[in-house]
From Swiss-Prot:
Primary location recorded for the protein, binned into one broad class: membrane
Name the record gives this protein: Maestro heat-like repeat-containing protein family member 7
Disulfide bonds: none
Gene name, Swiss-Prot/TrEMBL: MROH7
InterPro entries in the cross-refs: ARM-like, ARM-type_fold, HEAT_Maestro, HEAT_MROH2B-like, Maestro-like_HEAT, Maestro_heat-like_prot
HEAT repeat start-end pairs: 957-995, 1036-1074, 1079-1117, 1125-1162
Organism lineage: Eukaryota, Metazoa, Chordata, Craniata, Vertebrata
Residue ranges of the region described as Disordered: 1-42, 66-87, 106-150
Length: 1323
């Protein structure tokens, strides 16, 4: 059909028109000449419709027409035999038709005719016969040859097709009521308006109805058109009769036609823009059927407000047609639209678009019920060349009529612009006028965002309806119909995204494949056995057609993969009928791809290995039919690959011949020994298998080993396992070298699949690639295994053991060397990223240690493994690694799994290594001493390592010498953690006799260097090493010479390290020449220990106080000034610490204080050595303070500073006793107290009055009052001091004024201050 640009045809329908008597004839108006088509014509692509989101399925009407070759389907003449003698009526529609497909029209001739089957000529016009008549009267203004209606039908039966009718042949099963498949025979209702550049406005009535036996036809020519008036006679049953009384002339250039009001009550006129306007005011019929050809711009504006019926044809000759108005667009295969053409549809109840090529087997329909209220129309999607869309977004609220969209074959339209016309109706003077406004044209660059949303919404609704269908029966055709609709929607724009497409495929596949077997469904409902079988095959066919359409929609590797992934799980089902459906569908998709190969050739074949592997696996399926079909799919796949290869080489090949050749080459199927077919296929596909394909083949083979709750019998499982084993072994034997770059992916796939394989024999087959690949690519396999998730579960552990237990086993020596190399790596890279490689290597080593055959090789590198593991323990302290998850829950219900701590896992491997090497005593020793826990803490790791080394020395481990010589070079390597661990182990080995063989520079020299190390731990370890060396007589003097450096290195060190070092140094102080030791060393050691008296850790306080006393015992006369000053500065810390309430610490304090008093000859009050609390012994505290100030007056301010410092201690007991001590100490210092010191005390007490501990607050207030009273009594408080003013305004406790001395009561400023103080407290 060729349409010229600029033409416009508009239809207005009057909703107030009343029905007329039924007519049985179809008059025609037409000229015999068909003008030349427009020169700018092009072949157009297929037209598709885009639905609105409100569309729903329409029930089946169960009325159809049978296509008969050589005859018109729909209206049948007397000579047309019908099984039921029923007559079907064409729908009330507007039909736009063009010349017949495959026929050449003589556009220059005046008379157009066709030879019928009997040699007669048929006119181009199309008379219509109703079932009650054998002829239709025709009025024509042209010179067409006369022929009867039967001739006309025969002339056009095989050349013009019509969609919108239905098949009523009882021998043909019913398909989707929304998709009507027709033969190439068709019926054209009416003549042709064939003016290429004409525009017409037709306005049929809205509520009119024609009898079912009528089919009025309007035919308008484009050449010599004469005036003719038509009327409907009351008794003519719808026959149009010329009427010259009321005519309105329509003229456009050389066009002049008129129609009387009796026929349509319409007025025809043309404007300068060649737009014909026809106004309707009379009675008409709703069965109006008009056919238009070669009109380039068509606008339809009926005013219908009635409900819509999907199909207007029916079996019953006297039934009533429900739709008041509808439009049918009929196109032939060779018709075109010009680039500037457009179609405008407005307020049309039903829109049917139809087209077919000559060689098409089926017809396609687009039937769209349109909403009567155009204000709800939001937009229309334009046709996009190459994608074939024509969209009609239509609002369809709940309760409205439904819409069905069908595909139109390619070549129906070319670039056509769709427009939306909003037409509100307005009535004036009894005449109905249509006003066209708000016309929106959507071009190819139209925004498709809203259209995309509408399509997705429609698809989701259909998917939801599919999901609502029962999965245990097939009782309706809803699935089939829905998938057919989805097939048509796949041709519309925009295309679905990958996620939406995958979801759609999964839903449809699950809905069909989950159905029981056909036999089971038939047994459940025996009465409908045949219906169920037919419906099942139709449903499966609809699914396969949908998958093919989706494949065409997205012919990319990702698009095909989305289909194959949905089918994959079903191919491994334990149910034979589900596997058969999946294999059959796979083969169907492959066959479709083979037919459309040239279109997909540039993309190659995606997911080849996955699909090939699944099909190969099912060659060995217990069901022989499945195996045979799988082999047929492989043959098709091989043909596709060869065609692509030859296409790249630009070789022409016959598909059919190549397929038959491959079928003979790869077949036949051998049900007795399917493994022969498997080996043959794998061998021949070698040229097409790359690394990714090899990986997919292996993983597909593993899928066949999965267990199933409904798995087949034992023999069937064995057959599938055998097929998998043959497939795995043959692929790895022939193509192992190609899998090198995908070994990590293969190992990961095996690890994941093992979780689903439970049978022992199947697990052995699944682990086969591990040993086969490791025999050739050991390093790559080990690296891949190191990536397994941690902690290792049974699957990962079994993969590690597979390297050694199964043949061909790998070289254990090489394997251990690889693991040792991984253990020497840091778990944190230079970029700061955590790595699981060392921890994974430790886990792999732990699994290998369980294999007895490895022990000899392990012992060879035992020292290296032990030291590497100990260093890894240090590295993993406090480290959180990626991919580490908690192990599965315990068997006990409700038991919470312990969190996975990497350092504990490494410690476990150390234990395992020691036990396997026979060090059970050492392991037990560490358990008893808490060495493993020490090893896991960052501050005590070196102690745990040292404890292990000490145990190995104590129990004379045979490997100590090798470890000793290995450690010497390690002391200078690595980072701080590396050196600390190595040094901690090395220091304990200095007790061995073999150390004498080591040069002194590697023992004493290295330890001496460690004293100046910046890390305190290294200093402590060096002291430990020197103390051990000092046990040897030849090195004692050298070590004691280093004693001042050792003591000096303890300054500003953590208390625990100080305690550890001093405990080691005690051994040095013992000896014959201890009296000759310089006292300055002891004093310096005392200075180091004193600050740790107030350490928060009890063990540190207790140890330091105890060590302090022992050092004092080592002091000898004469007492030096440094000694006296140091011991005097110890008095207050010991007195205050004694009151903290800890009996153990208090006891150590008393003992140390006695030692100090003995050495210094102090005469302290006896109560000073008492551990009783000071709460009710204020006089005792005052007596102690008075003794201290009187005895050590020069150190009084030191005592005050120390007590103020303890007032800041974190322990409340120390803060309280320090406040009490200050309250007694300050009055004793009245003669030497300065204003600055007093202000310092005042500030400290003010802060303590807000202490969180209530007792501290109370004692702080009491002490403040006591100090104030003492100052007044002794008159040493300076005038104008802020102490009084501040206390008067803030003090919360009122001192007793009556107890003040009389001399002070006369001082006005003091009494004034006290008065204001009282007032403030009362407030």
């Amino acid at each position: 059909m060729a349409l010229s640009p600029g033409a416009n045809l508009v239809f207005h329908e009057d909703p107030k028109m009343t029905p007329s008597p039924p007519s049985c004839g179809a008059p025609g108006l037409g000229s015999g000449t068909i003008p030349q088509p427009h020169p700018d014509m092009a072949q157009v692509p297929m037209l598709n419709l885009l639905p609105s989101p409100g569309l729903a399925l329409v029930p089946d009407l169960n009325d159809s027409l049978s296509p008969v070759s050589g005859e018109a389907s729909g209206l049948v003449s007397e000579n047309t035999p019908r099984p039921d003698d029923s007559r079907a009526i064409a729908p009330a529609s507007l039909q736009i038709t063009s010349s017949c497909s495959g026929e050449a029209l003589d556009l220059d001739s005046k008379d157009v005719s066709r030879p019928d089957s009997q040699g007669r000529l048929c006119p181009a016009s199309n008379p219509i016969l109703s079932p009650s008549s054998t002829e239709a009267p025709r009025l024509s203004s042209g010179n067409h040859p006369q022929s009867n209606s039967e001739d006309a039908f025969k002339c056009l039966s095989s050349k013009i097709f019509k969609l919108g009718q239905r098949n009523s042949n009882p021998s043909r099963h019913e398909l989707n009521p929304f998709i009507r498949h027709h033969s190439r025979e068709g019926l054209v209702l009416g003549h042709c308006i064939s003016r290429p550049s004409s525009k017409a406005l037709l306005i049929p009535t809205s509520n009119s109805s024609l009898d079912l036996d009528s089919n009025p036809l309007l035919n308008m020519g484009s050449r010599n058109t004469s005036k003719l008036n038509l009327n409907v006679a009351p008794d003519s049953h719808g026959t149009l009769i010329p009427d010259t009384n009321e005519t309105i002339t329509l003229a456009s250039h050389n066009i002049s036609e008129s129609v009387s009001k009796g026929a349509f009550s319409t007025t025809w006129s043309t404007s300068s823009k060649e737009t014909m306007n026809v106004a309707s005011s009379g009675h008409s019929r709703s069965d109006l059927s008009v056919t238009i050809t070669q009109a380039s711009y068509v606008t339809l504006i009926p005013g219908s407000s009635y409900g819509i019926s999907l199909h207007s044809s029916t079996h019953e000759p006297n039934s009533t047609i429900s739709p008041p108005s509808c439009m049918t667009l009929i196109l032939g295969s060779n018709e075109t639209l010009s680039l500037d053409s457009s179609l405008l549809f407005s307020d049309t109840s039903t829109l049917t678009l139809s087209s077919q090529q000559d060689d098409a087997k089926d017809n396609s329909i687009h039937t769209v019920p349109l909403e009567e209220n155009l204000e709800s129309w939001s937009e229309m999607a334009s046709i996009k060349v190459g994608q074939f869309p024509l969209g009609f977004p239509i609002s369809n609220p709940a309760g409205k009529d439904a819409v069905t969209l069908q595909g139109i074959p390619e070549g129906a339209f070319d670039e056509v612009t769709s427009c939306l016309v909003k037409v509100p109706e307005k009535t004036e003077g009894g005449n109905n006028m249509a006003l066209v406004e708000n016309v929106t044209t959507l071009q190819k660059s139209q925004d498709l965002l809203e259209a995309e949303g509408e399509k997705k919404t429609m698809i989701k609704k259909i998917m939801r309806q599919i999901q609502e269908e029962p999965l245990d029966s097939l009782s309706s055709s809803v699935r089939k119909q829905a998938m057919e609709i989805l097939t048509q929607l796949s041709h519309t724009q925009p295309t679905l995204g990958m996620r939406e497409r995958s979801e759609l495929v999964n839903v449809c596949v699950h809905s069909v494949f989950s159905l029981p077997s056909v036999q089971a469904m038939q047994e459940k409902d025996e009465a409908k056995a045949e219906t169920i079988q037919a419906l099942y095959h139709q449903t499966l066919e609809a699914l396969q057609t949908l998958l093919k359409a989706l494949f065409i929609e997205d012919p990319t590797p990702a698009g095909l993969k989305s289909i194959l992934e949905a089918l994959g799980p079903w191919m491994n089902s334990g149910k034979a009928h589900e596997r058969a459906r999946a294999v059959n569908t796979n083969v169907s998709v492959l066959n479709h791809m083979l037919l459309t190969l040239p279109f997909f050739m540039p993309l190659g074949f995606p997911a080849l290995g996955l699909l090939l592997g699944r099909l190969i696996l099912h060659i060995g399926d217990p069901d022989e039919e499945i195996g045979c079909e799988a082999l047929d799919g492989i043959i098709i796949l091989y043909t596709i690959l060869e065609l692509q290869k030859r296409a790249r080489d630009k070789e022409e090949t016959n598909k059919k011949e190549l397929y038959e050749s491959n079928k003979h080459f790869l077949g036949p199927y051998n049900p007795v020994s399917p493994c022969q077919n498997i080996l043959r296929v794998i061998e021949e596909f070698g040229d097409f298998l790359g690394p990714q394909q090899i990986k997919d083949l292996l993983l597909a083979a593993l899928e066949g080993l999965k267990g199933s709750s409904e798995a087949p019998g034992k023999d069937s499982r064995e057959m599938m396992q055998l097929a998998s084993e043959v497939m795995l072994s043959s692929v790895l034997e022939w193509y192992r070298h190609r899998a090198l770059e995908v070994i990590p992916e293969i190992m990961q796939g095996i690890y994941m699949q093992l979780s689903h394989i439970q049978e022992p024999r199947a697990r052995q087959v699944a682990l086969l690639p591990v040993s086969l690949l490791a025999s050739s690519f050991m390093t790559e396999v080990v690296v891949a295994l190191l990536m397994c998730p941690l902690p290792l579960n049974s699957n990962g552990a079994e993969m590690w053991r597979q390297l050694i237990l199964c043949k061909p086993s790998c070289d254990v020596r090489d394997l251990l060397d690889l693991l040792l190399g991984s253990l020497k790596e840091k778990p944190v890279t230079k970029e700061g990223r955590a790595s699981i490689v060392p921890l994974a290597a430790a886990s792999g080593l732990c699994e290998l240690l369980s294999v007895n055959s490895c022990m000899g090789r392990v012992r060879r590198i035992y020292p290296q493994l032990l030291l590497a593991l100990l260093i890894q323990v240090h590295y993993h302290i406090g480290l959180n690694l990626p991919g580490c998850v908690a192990p599965p829950k315990d068997t006990k219900k409700g038991a919470q799994p312990s969190p996975f701590v990497p350092v504990r896992w490494v410690v476990k491997v150390v234990k395992t290594l020691l036990l396997r090497m026979g060090c059970s005593y050492e392991t037990t020793f560490l358990e008893d001493q808490g060495g493993w826990e020490l090893m896991e803490q960052v501050e005590s790791h070196h102690r745990g390592v040292a404890l292990l080394a000490r145990a190995m020395v104590q129990y004379s481990c045979q490997e100590l010498c090798r470890i000793l010589y290995l450690l010497i070079p390690l002391l200078e390597r690595g980072d701080e953690k590396h050196r600390i661990t190595a040094t901690a182990f090395f220091v304990e080995l200095l007790q061995m006799e073999q150390v004498r063989r080591i040069p002194e520079e590697y023992s004493l020299g290295r330890m001496a260097e460690g004293l100046s190390h910046h890390d305190p731990i290294m200093k402590v370890l060096s002291i430990r090493g020197l103390v051990i060396l000092a046990r040897r007589s030849e090195k004692t003097a050298k070590v004691k010479a280093l004693l001042p450096s050792m003591v000096k290195g303890l300054k500003n060190m953590d208390g625990m390290l100080v305690v550890e070092a001093v405990h080691n140094l005690k051994a040095v102080f013992k000896g014959r020449d201890q009296k000759l030791m310089d006292s300055a060393v002891y004093v310096e050691m005392l200075q180091i220990l004193l600050p740790h008296f107030s350490d928060a850790r009890e063990v540190v306080r207790s140890s330091c106080i105890n060590l302090y006393g022992k050092v004092v015992q080592k002091l000898r006369a004469p007492r030096t000034q440094a000694m006296e000053e140091q011991l005097v500065s110890t008095l207050v810390p010991l007195l205050l610490t004694m009151q903290e309430g800890n009996s153990k610490v208090s006891q150590k304090c008393v003992k140390t204080l006695l030692r100090c008093s003995y050495f210094m000859a102090w005469e302290l009050p006896k109560r000073a050595y008492s551990r009783k609390p000071w709460d009710n012994q204020q006089q005792t505290v005052a007596k102690i303070c008075k003794c201290l100030v009187n005895t050590h007056r020069d150190s009084a301010f030191i005592f005050l500073s120390q007590s103020l410092e303890y007032a800041k201690n974190s322990r409340a007991s120390l803060r309280k006793c320090s406040v009490m001590f200050i309250g007694s100490l300050v009055p004793c210092m009245e003669s030497i107290m300065t204003e600055d010191r007093l202000n310092e005390v005042k500030a400290a007490l003010d802060n303590l009055r807000h202490d969180p501990e209530a007792s501290v607050c109370i004692y702080a207030a009491q002490v403040q009052d006591h100090i104030l009273a003492s100052c007044w009594q002794n008159s040493w408080l300076p005038h104008g001091n802020s102490w009084v003013c501040y206390s008067a305004t803030t003090h919360r406790w009122s001192p007793s004024c009556e107890n003040l001395p009389t001399s002070h009561q006369r001082r006005s400023w003091i009494m004034q201050a006290l008065g204001s103080w009282k007032m403030s407290l009362k407030k």
